[in-house]
Amino acid sequence: MKEVMSVNETVREALAIALLKLMKSQEFAKIAVSDIVRVAGVGRSSFYRNFDSKEDLICSYITELYRERFESREIPVRLYGSGNIEEFLTPRFNFIKEHEDIFKTLHRQNMLYNFFIMIENDIVPILCGHN
């Protein structure tokens, strides 16, 4: 069960949800920080206290979801020597499926690259046989 979020965590999540909502109807490049904070119902200073850019916001949000998913459970963070590749990859594909709406939005915005860069250090060594 997730612990109670701090006010700052709540603000960060509200900003991310607002950005994702806007991304469903607008091009990412045309979304202004003022649009995000308006939809999130927070002040502009809240955005800049937490993030350097819109890209930072979306990447931070997905990173946090990813960390929550994989640090809170007994899921292999890395696959070493005797590990099973299915045990490693299946939870990651399930993560994408569980957050399908986010990933579809990222895909429509041509931003999936950001997610794959984030998990690159996990998956590339496995795919190259260097576990």
Please identify what each model-predicted range represents.
Residues 1-8:
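N-terminal intrinsically disordered/low-complexity leader segments
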Residues 13-21, 39, 56-76, 87, ...:
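Alpha-helical structural segments
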Residues 22-56:
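Helix-turn-helix
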Residues 31-32, 104-106, 115:
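Short, hydrophobic secondary-structure boundary micro-motifs
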Residues 110-131:
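Amphipathic alpha-helical packing segments from all-alpha helical-bundle domains
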